[in-house]
Amino acid sequence: MRTHYCGQLNAALDGQIVTLCGWAHRRRDHGGVIFIDLRDREGLAQVVCDPDRADTFKIAESVRNEFCLKITGKVRPRPAGTTNANLASGEIEILCHEIEVLNPSVTPPFQLDEDNLSENVRLLHRVIDLRRPQMQNNLMLRYKTSRAFRRFLDDNGFIDIETPMLTKSTPEGARDYLVPSRVHPGQFFALPQSPQLFKQLLMVAGYDRYYQIVKCFRDEDLRADRQPEFTQVDIETSFMSEAEIMALTEKLIRTVFKEAIDVDLPDFPRMTYAEAMHRFGSDKPDLRVTLELTEVTDAFKDVAFKVFAGVANSEGGRIAAMRIPGGATLTRGEIDAYTQFVGIYGAKGLAYIKVNDASQINETGLQSPIVKNLSEASLKAVIERTGAQSGDLIFFGADKAKIVNDALGALRIKIGHEKGFVTGAKWAPLWVIDFPMFEYDDESKRWTACHHPFTSPKDEHLDLLVSDPGKCLAKAYDLALNGWELGGGSVRIHRSDVQEKVFSALNIGPEEQQAKFGFLLDALKYGAPPHGGLAFGLDRIVTMMTGAESIRDVIAFPKTQRAQCLLTDAPSGVDEKQLRELHIRLRQKVETQVEVGQP
């Protein structure tokens, strides 16, 4: 039906007859001459309809926004002074010879150039929203990014292999989406949270290098960077060390950013998990922010201020200081707002000291309600360790280490961007390595896996699996960029005896091991090769590339933060016949639970 896309037209086509198909983005009547901006996925083209062609002009008069049109005409230069440098076709226009309305449109629920639209309105009318140039640019970039991943992986010997969507429910950290089986009453499939076990089995089967751009599912509470179904670039390889996997992956990400958005990423420094938490309170720190945390726990063990002394002498407590250069000018209102902010992360308060005169380590030089209850030695230690100068402010976090890290880590980012404590770099990648294998869950009184139960411990820490799991480090690595986790992975356990020890450390007994992971343990006994890999969140990567506020802006049909699709009204109820076929009966009071096995 057409010869060209609108965005492909340029001055080189001057004098040629072209046929375009698309939508009327805007129609303007200028004193007897009608201009139609025709839009398709590649861009806009200006079409000129003059009264000399009466039939064509009459149709043009009836055209309204979002009419679907087919237009044939002659390419010609725009008159002097009317070119548009913002358009690929901005030097030319189309003199309309023929116009056909392929389908008229009712009045759209909003104009495509409206800025102040609520997200719910956009998601309810997603088809119209997807016509907006910004959304089309986002999804085109998503395609280019996926293509760049595929090209690199194909060129480096990776094989694209599909893994099952209907699989077994296994504990991987989040709730599974369950699918009831009609032919096996009372039993359920689960939608995969990742292809983790299947890609490991493919390595055991000898496929050496695997990849897949795949949908994954997690039934978890949503945030700006989460969706119940999301896309990851999943990678696994055999006979490669931790360092070799990271080197190949770094080359992959550099290639993808260069091909997709023409960005040359800077060096990828490496930092241990312990250092990242110590200095930044985060395992995915934004290195563009120059503020850092300073450890001062030991300085407050003997002070009169019980809030600090209690934490300093407790197991698992941490007191960290964060120096804000020039922060003594912060108002009481600003400090109160920051105090309220850290409360989101469980902090009970936000102590501070204004450094009016760094040479006087007393109430004259230091201004704060807590100074009188702190010793000169403790105050001197804080000033020296933070490097505080006159005119600075020091914030303190004092609580369990996790709360301090979460609260001050988030405050660091907030103040850093609000007050301009950032470097000029646009991109700041970072490898975080040497993660702990386990973390202790106080609520369940047991160890849990920091990554997943299939991550290999460091060779020199194998004995710690039994003797001291808390000190055991993993062959795990995460790639962070600008404070976002782009992806993460690990070398996997390839010996069944080691896998059994890790399960035991996680309080998964022999019977449960066989019931849930027997197929994996058996496979590892058949000469499983050393293997490892990682996965990248495609949605997050494209979000960063576009600068979008939410990953919902780079997904064609996303769910809301309540895990709903407003366009199709999903999830929705089903009729009684379908429930009977699945051997499910809803409780009288509508709840999320179901009773299984009842006809």
Swiss-Prot record:
UniProt key word rRNA processing: no
Disulfide bonds: none
A GO molecular function held by the record: aspartate-tRNA ligase activity
Main location (coarse class): cytoplasm
Residues involved in ATP binding: R218, D219, E220, Q227, E485, G537, L538, D539, R540
Keyword Hydrolase annotated: no
Chain intervals for the UniProt region annotation (Aspartate): 196-199
Family membership: Belongs to the class-II aminoacyl-tRNA synthetase family. Type 1 subfamily.
Protein name: Aspartate--tRNA(Asp/Asn) ligase
Species, as recorded: Dechloromonas aromatica (strain RCB)
